[in-house]
Amino acid sequence: MSSAVPMASMSTYAILGCGSVGHAVAEQLESEGKDVLIIDNDEGRVEALRDQDLDARTADIAETDVAEVIADRDVVLVMSADIEANKTAVRHVRERGGDQFIVVRASDPVTADELTELGVDVVINPSEVIADSALRALE
């Protein structure tokens, strides 16, 4: 699995879990004209996203049928803060046997290793990203 896939070659995205991180990703992708489908279990959040003209649906990302709903997407970004739900969502997507590019949020190095073993293409640990950004700002 490669972590260096050109974004230009990917046109359809699913964002599973749309808190502040997922929302920022969705807005950036939308601004670039990408086709984005957002799945979140918070009905209020989904309504707010729809009010912003984003394609959002209410569902629990850990449910098996979500993998079916997003089966046609090139890229799956699993951005929930619920790490167990993220692991379950990744399992369901990979069990379908597709070749979707999966980016997932982790909370620590152990979780990152577990997600990598599940077949994730890229693991992001927000704490590490923030630390790296802070250190770069000091340079």
Which sequence ranges carry the predicted segments?
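Cytosolic regulatory regions of ion transport systems
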Residues: 1-139
